[in-house]
Amino acid sequence: MKLLPFVNGPALLAAVLLSFPLAAQSIVPIPPAQDPQIESHVKAFLKVLNSGGGKPLEQMAPKDARAVLVGAQKSVKVDLSGILVTEKTIVQDGLSVKITVVKPVGVVGALPAFMFFHGGGWVLGDFPTHQRMLRDLVVSSGAVGVFVNYTPSPEAHYPVAINQAYAATKWVAAHGKEIGVDGKRLAVAGNSVGGNMAAVVALMAKDKKGPALRLQVLFWPVTNANFETVSYNQFATDRFLTKTLMMWFWDNYTTNPSERKEIYASPLLATTQQLAGLPPAFVQTAENDVLRDEGEAYARKLDEAGVNVTAVRYNGMIHDWGLLNPLSQVPGTKSAMLQAAAELKKALK
């Protein structure tokens, strides 16, 4: 990774990240600086990001790419107050999984909970990179967040991570009292590929007659291994998550075409019959995100299957805007977290 000049705040995260390479595309997108669809704070973030000259993540070793995100999230001071964090290793169905339990302070008794599966393309990300986002959801919802530390790729490939996610969900539903949780008031949530995992865990719970989930919260989710949607081509470059980077993430997760078509990898390919009976869904997408179209398509398909769905597109935003600490004070981020927390609170009461 290239060393870049020292800058503060949003500029620092942008600078230490990378400048993504151009990808083949069927249309020529508008440069971010001239794009009226990008919110002003986000546009300033992208201006520095895209002029950084750093090495693309997809050209790094996974451990180096992970370090970039960790350092970037640490570069901005954020509010982590109001929560109590503990760790526990659980065993379920022969799988050992470490969970990080995030509770709101000053609350006693068994609380409702939501499982949280983190984003980062199945390759990047951990609890520290997602702590601020999780904290915001916990404090505003009053529910416990159970962060699942699944094994990333390429150390493990599909379906290892999703099996760990489902095992952890089963354990919390059955043994929640051990961590101060009411397992009968349980939801699933996740961002990006974590949104994929939340959707898939909901499918698995239905198929396997597992936990009765109250809600699935899908933040800008991955739902299909199809890189030729309108949004993939329109936003292929210069908007944080690029087409080539997402292809690299999928390659680390699974390169097997038949596996990519399984509904536990690409839930958008599930039939309406397979989707019928799933818990209500709350789906957020970003206007300027390669994943926008597949997230919205999944919401529409859930609705077609008779599932209660609320789908919200945040105009002006880019992929993972709600995760990125330098964008944590952007009005669109605050509103997104408050809205999701309100949906959790309503479903888990």
What is each PLM-predicted segment?
Residues 1-12:
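Bacterial N-terminal signal peptides that target proteins for export
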Residues 26-349:
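Alpha/beta-hydrolase superfamily serine-hydrolase fold, recognizing
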Residues 19-21:
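N-terminal signal peptide c-region/cleavage motif recognized by signal peptidases
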